[in-house]
Swiss-Prot record:
Protein name: Aquaporin PIP 1-3
SUPFAM superfamilies recorded: Aquaporin-like
Gene that this sequence comes from: PIP1-3
Phylogenetic classification of the source organism: Eukaryota, Viridiplantae, Streptophyta, Embryophyta, Tracheophyta
Gene Ontology biological-process entries: response to water deprivation
Cited PANTHER family: AQUAPORIN OR AQUAGLYCEROPORIN RELATED
Native species: Oryza sativa subsp. japonica (Rice)
Length: 288
């Protein structure tokens, strides 16, 4: 283990970049920039590092808090006879987006601030983190989501069950294809924003980019929720959908559950391919 290297930017990969920032970077030649090495597929060495487990715990806690706050907000809207008396769809969208903004800001320096298996999957496909770390993150995210939804149910069981438990489903008037398409496009928007906000080359050139990264990510979540809540209740996060479905545990929560895994993973894969092949053109760059 390489000792005390705990820089977890770019998906919590220990392979770091040392690049100039601010005006120094702006004056540097393009050729001075070097692509960071790709993360290995398997990195058994990580299993002996405390920073690896610390990052997983951070993902668990962040996803726990995300489900706790967001589902409570959904319940507050659903229990009211008049949506005018509540925060409404806009408030739900702000709750989800605002929590992602806050939690990414808090955990980015520890785990990379994924809080979403689709984000982790996209970063893995782009070789920003190892399979070992990706699987561990996804497991901790799902466990955190289940616990977050479970605590809400424990506090207000009657209201929780009566308001649908925040579980995702394709709403009446829409087909399964509509729901799948909404999840694919919505997750593409999110993961594409994550790649852009954490792009190493932009971070090297502009010193303000790493500081502001949580803002566009949270705002992307907000906008996607505004657009797709009427269609699927907005998943774009398999852990969020799984946690609510397991704790609510009613038949309709499982009917379309596959959509909330397949859609986000396809969207994340498309975003990763677009970033690597088109935006960064990494396969076409000279190996010299």
């Amino acid at each position: 283990m390489e000792g005390k290297e705990e820089d977890v930017r770019l998906g919590a990969n220990r392979y770091t970049e040392r690049q100039p920032i601010g005006t120094a970077a702006q004056g540097a030649e393009e050729k001075d920039y070097r692509e960071p090495p790709a993360a290995p597929v398997f990195e058994v060495e990580e299993l002996t590092s405390w920073s690896f487990y610390r990052a997983g715990i951070a993902e668990f806690v962040a996803t726990f808090l995300f489900l706790y706050i967001s589902i409570l907000t959904v319940m507050g809207v659903n229990k009211s006879a008049s949506k005018c008396a509540t925060v409404g769809i806009q408030g739900i969208a702000w709750s989800f987006g605002g929590m992602i903004f806050a939690l990414v800001y808090c955990t980015a320096g520890i785990s990379g601030g994924h809080i979403n298996p689709a984000v982790t999957f996209g970063l893995f496909l782009a070789r920003k983190l190892s399979l070992t770390r990706a699987v561990f993150y996804m497991a901790m995210q799902c466990l955190g989501a289940i616990c977050g939804a479970g605590v809400v149910k424990g506090f207000q069981r009657g209201l929780y069950m009566g308001s649908g438990g925040g579980a995702n489903a394709v709403n009446p008037g829409y087909t399964k294809g509509d729901g799948l398409g909404a999840e694919i496009v919505g997750t593409f928007v999110l993961v594409y924003t994550v790649f852009s906000a954490t792009d190493a080359k932009r971070n090297a050139r502009d010193s303000h980019v790493p500081i502001l990264a949580p803002l566009p990510i949270g705002f992307a979540v907000f906008l996607v929720h505004l657009a797709t809540i009427p269609i699927t209740g907005t998943g774009i996060n398999p852990a969020r959908s799984l946690g609510a479905a397991i704790v609510y545990n009613r038949a309709h929560a499982w009917h379309d559950h596959w959509i909330f895994w397949v859609g986000p993973f396809i969207g994340a894969a498309l975003a990763a391919i677009y970033h690597v092949v088109v935006i960064r053109a990494i396969p076409f760059k000279s190996r010299d």
